[in-house]
Amino acid sequence: MDQRKGSGSDANGGLAEATASRLRFEDPDEVMEENPAAAAATVGAEEEGGEGGGGEEVIGSDKTSADYYFDSYSHFGIHEEMLKDVVRTKSYQNVITQNSFLFKDKIVLDVGAGTGILSLFCAKAGAKHVYAIECSQMADMAKEIVKTNGYSNVITVIKGKVEEIELPVPKVDVIISEWMGYFLLFENMLNTVLYARDKWLADGGVVLPDKASLHLTAIEDAEYKEDKIEFWNNVYGFDMRCIKKQAMMEPLVDTVDANQIVTNCQLLKTMDISKMTPGDASFTVPFKLVAERNDYIHALVAYFNVSFTKCHKMMGFSTGPRSKATHWKQTVLYLEDVLTICEGETITGSMTVTPNKKNPRDIDIKLCYALSGHRCQVSRTQHYKMR
């Protein structure tokens, strides 16, 4: 996985219409609101647009991939980036504060609590007690933050892996977590939320967020593909094309300009966090992208939306290129071919997503695509590895 040099993670960017499930994604101070029943009815027809489990790869003699994962969340910088992501943090804050009926006098479990910001929001909304689980060294800071802000009697920070700790209570009423990674599923924290759900969530309990969806579109990106991929053809007069193949397999995480979008935005996969199983995070789905103008296509771009459907009114946010930028940005999958496409022509194919066998926090992606157009005919399969 790569990132553009100099690309920022701030949430500056124009608001625009997001096109998932016909939901209205708003400015983070308002958050998305819509009729949940109506939105659910459109999902099937739509074509628009930190802790881990077992099986960790051993790295070196005494550290697993999980150890490195948790170590990364011990650094302040990553938490600063997430807290400064206004779309992310304000959306969660608004969901909690504007729907206090979900939290008032309830037992809440915060999975992957980090600095404890979501736990603090829940406590302020009237939660009876919040159990904040955090495996990294940030748990020590979270305890101090909770104490400093006067919530030690409401929030209990527990340091450890969700799969290894025991709660002082048999069941909780609410599980809240910000588990999403790049490409929605990178880092595989979702399985930890599902483990907590199955072990501790009471009958009639709520998981927040409870819906997530993955989307795909196609873009023109000649300039950066030239800089990132074609660069290896001639490096100061030397042929380094052996690296080019590896560079093609590494998805790029970056903010895509909405003007680069050439096709519609296609819903790939919808996940119901309250009902799904860990196996549902591995899937093969078809797609059909229709060109909205004559142009070249250099890459496909994936992004995700999340929804909180148990609120008074449905709320959520999008990480799409037509929405305000987030620290998740978008995931760019460069194509070996440059596709010359005319308005109305279609790229058809399928995407297979699976956790890596050696390290389930990583993702393997298989992309099959075909275009049979007036100016371009191509059919190809490519493999990508998010590491």
From Swiss-Prot:
The active site is at residues 178, 187. PROSITE patterns: SAM_MT_PRMT (PS51678). Residues 34-44 have a biased composition (Low complexity). It comes from the Eukaryota. Residues 1-60 are annotated as: Disordered. Its EC number is 2.1.1.319. GO terms for cellular component: nucleus. It is found in: Nucleus. Its main location: nucleus. One of its GO terms (molecular function) is protein-arginine N-methyltransferase activity. One of its GO terms (biological process) is regulation of DNA-templated transcription. S-adenosyl-L-methionine binds at residues 79, 88, 112, 134, 163. Arginine methyltransferase that methylates (mono and asymmetric dimethylation) the guanidino nitrogens of arginyl residues present in target proteins. This is Protein arginine N-methyltransferase 1. The gene is PRMT1.
